[in-house]
Amino acid sequence: MADYQDKNVVIIGLGLTGLSCVDFFLARGVTPRVMDTRVTPPGLDKLPQEVERHVGGLNDEWLLAADLIVASPGIALAHPSLSAAASAGVEIVGDIELFCREAQAPIVAITGSNGKSTVTTLVGEMAKAAGVNVGVGGNIGLPALMLLDADRELYVLELSSFQLETTSSLQAAAATVLNVTEDHMDRYPFGLQQYRAAKLRVYEKAKVCVVNADDALTMPVRGADERCVSFGVNMGDYHLNRQQGETWLRVKGEKVLNVKEMKLSGQHNYTNALAALALADAVGLPRASSLKALTTFTGLAHRFQLALEHNGVRWINDSKATNVGSTEAALNGLHVDGTLHLLLGGDGKSADFSPLARYLTGDRIRLYCFGRDGAQLAALRPEIAQQTETMEEAMRLLAPRVQPGDMVLLSPACASLDQFKNFEQRGDVFTRLAKELG
């Protein structure tokens, strides 16, 4: 447990995570100062009166006078104000670092470009099925500091690359990097390897590293070692096995579950299940209750979620596909009886869209591209693409064309912030329009 007495603490960024940091310090007799670049950040009205605040920008004077800065993952460490503070010797951490210094129970730490939330939630469900007092959160649900509880027996945290950059005390009982594909390139000017390096920090001091046998970028820098357990489609300690038209989850050659018993569907979800099982096994959760959790888990909203099935047409909401890798995961191994009507678009965050091209072949696919980077996406295969300003226009365009056996899939490969509040709002609008048009 760290001692923060008499420390001059500055918290950057409000919202739920910022407020959890304020509460953390107040409970330890330290009154922090708070700043936020937004003029009216969420949570401002919930800030106790004694806490000094500075909004609408950063206060360099406060930062340089601080002993400790707790930075929101939303602000880049490369920001000139943070760089100056770091150069002056000020310690900069995030809420996950504060959490790791306090947590008394084992931690399962999950990162990756795609699938993090599903795997985090699944491991949490496996722990609950075993009767374990588990805290689940971090980058999803509740901020980590709100999970701290002396009675907890296990923590399961989803961690972003930004959170890992400011974390050095994590000693995970089991850690995984599920996959590494281009995302947030606007925050990583040195490209994919810089982003990967942030993700791989999760393995430092971990007891067990769960790696993806199909993605070399998920391996620790020095290569796989005796701490590593692997999962993959055809390879790995945990893998898929197809026999007589049926698919099984297998562990080291032993069949453990037929996927038809699972409510999740799609190859990417089967590998998510393998990763979750590997993590659960690594921290000693009973295999039987973990498998039971796999048969009852229905998946998370906006992640390849069936919004409507009507007149033989399936409308799928995969709004959480905010990067290219996530859309690749949705398209890889996808079976559609008729034509796939694929909705792509939004803010591509400077990503390279070309890896999608190999999934856009044949004559049973149509593209509807919208938003800031719609033109770039339409250029992947212009002869089957139509470009509109908004997703709603695209959906009204495609609705009269769908036939029984077709699928309408929103898997945009882009962030939503150019036209929506967040990916959830985009998914909700898609679902509402699907019910109206379908």
Curated annotation (Swiss-Prot):
It is found in: Cytoplasm. SUPFAM superfamilies: MurCD N-terminal domain, MurD-like peptide ligases, catalytic domain, MurD-like peptide ligases, peptide-binding domain. Keywords: ATP-binding, Cell cycle, Cell division, Cell shape, Cell wall biogenesis/degradation, Cytoplasm, Ligase, Nucleotide-binding, Peptidoglycan synthesis. It is an enzyme of class 6 (ligase). InterPro entries: Mur-like_cat_sf (IPR036565), Mur_ligase_C (IPR004101), Mur_ligase_C_dom_sf (IPR036615), Mur_ligase_cen (IPR013221), MurD (IPR005762). One of its GO terms (cellular component) is cytoplasm. Its EC number is 6.3.2.9. It catalyses: UDP-N-acetyl-alpha-D-muramoyl-L-alanine + D-glutamate + ATP = UDP-N-acetyl-alpha-D-muramoyl-L-alanyl-D-glutamate + ADP + phosphate + H(+). It holds the Pfam family Mur_ligase_C. GO terms for molecular function: ATP binding; UDP-N-acetylmuramoylalanine-D-glutamate ligase activity. ATP binds at G112, S113, N114, G115, K116, S117, T118. Pathway: Cell wall biogenesis; peptidoglycan biosynthesis. GO terms for biological process: cell division; cell wall organization; peptidoglycan biosynthetic process; regulation of cell shape. Cell wall formation. Catalyzes the addition of glutamate to the nucleotide precursor UDP-N-acetylmuramoyl-L-alanine (UMA). Belongs to the MurCDEF family. This is UDP-N-acetylmuramoylalanine--D-glutamate ligase. It comes from Salmonella paratyphi A (strain ATCC 9150 / SARB42).
